[in-house]
Amino acid sequence: MDGVIDVNDMGDKGDIVILALNSGSSSFKFGLYRVRAPTAHASGIEPLLSDSIAMPTPQEAIAGIASRIAKFALAAPQAIGHRIVHGGPALRQHCVMDDAVLRQLEAAAPFAPLHTPAALAVMRAAQECFAGLPHVACFDTVFHADMPDVARVLPIPSQLQLEGIQRYGFHGLSCESIVQQLGDGLPTRLIIAHLGNGASITAIHRGQSIDTSMGLTPTGGVIMGTRSGDLDPGVLVYLMRENKLDGAMLEQLVNHQSGLLGISGVSSDMRRLHQAALSNANAGLAIQMFCASVAKQIAAMITVLDGVDLIVFTGGIGENDALVRTEVCRGLSWIGVSLDEHRNQAVGETIHNHLDVAINTTKSRCAVRVVASQEDGQIARHTWALMPQRHPGT
């Protein structure tokens, strides 16, 4: 594939300062890292600057990042890594950006309409601001690329599968960062619940993704902030036939008007829903349905794994919402999941310092931990790995 460099031929690149750009569906984060060879795939990443930034326009956001780097007199980046949610059927490996890759990304935009157009706009702005630097596309789908057919193949006619219609899976960089952090403590059977404005559940066996809740697009799976999650296809057929909704209207419905926002009629923000639930029954129902959806999907992944050794909560809600963790685990009490509520409630005071907090009781039949997602660090690692060979003195 154009732009792909053999990661086994990296040579002596030494230390590289890398800017990781992470544009999500509801946030824009960035991190500046010094990646040290030869430990880039272990612990050799030094964060120099990490933050989120308002993004009125991609150009202003990138200019703001460049300004902060200059303000703090930090080392200028030598390469830029970009989180790309979906590369479509053609892009299944992290790769160095070139014109051919850009064209393939543009063609794949319909697979992730909430994410890809915004990421492409950020990429173009970054290419203008940091002209001449290599830019690397890091895909959320790569982590799930080797899922077994029983998980990957969708129950549709085979000729449609040839068009690339299959389960891709997402939040791969987040899942990979959890596996990386667990290191030697990685269990055989791991379930990761990445809960944020977008949410997914992934079953991991010996470090490999074997099933995940999102499918062809990031709209499927559990209930999310504004996304419906799994929905009877008959609902969409009914709306097309009886309400005369076209494709654009259905896309708006399932991606922007559903989920927590659609159920509550109040907000897609879980923090606001907790407040509203004190007086608004629909807000309370939205929270209940979200937690039930997550617990149900975790239970399904337990079946896939033939048991579970560790459940990890991560993402904005997973790391910060003790009530959601309590309700989800209450729905899993039948398999012996038991939380230490004191530890669970104290997570907010410790997670961002310690990154990894155990919250299960000693009697729990599986471990439960809250682990901070470090997508940006993974972007930096992959960007380092794809840099051309740099010899001393060059």
Identify the residue ranges that each predicted region occupies:
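Short glycine-rich, Thr/Ser-proximal phosphate-binding strand/loop in the N-terminal lobe
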Residues: 6-9, 18-59, 215
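Short glycine-aspartate micro-motif
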Residues: 16-21, 79-81, 136, 190-194
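Glycine-rich beta-strand-to-loop/alpha-helix junction loops that act as flexible
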Residues: 23-24, 82-87, 195-197, 308, ...
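Short beta-strand-loop/turn "lid" adjacent to the catalytic site in phosphate-handling enzymes
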Residues: 69-119, 133-136, 142-154
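Glycine-rich phosphate-binding loop of actin/hexokinase-like ATP-binding domains
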Residues: 143-242
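Catalytic phosphate/nucleotide-handling subdomain of diverse soluble enzymes
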Residues: 205, 211-246, 252, 315-354, ...
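Adenine-nucleotide phosphate-binding core of ATP-dependent small-molecule kinases
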Residues: 252, 259-263, 270-304
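Internal helix-turn-beta structural module
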Residues: 284, 288-309, 318-393
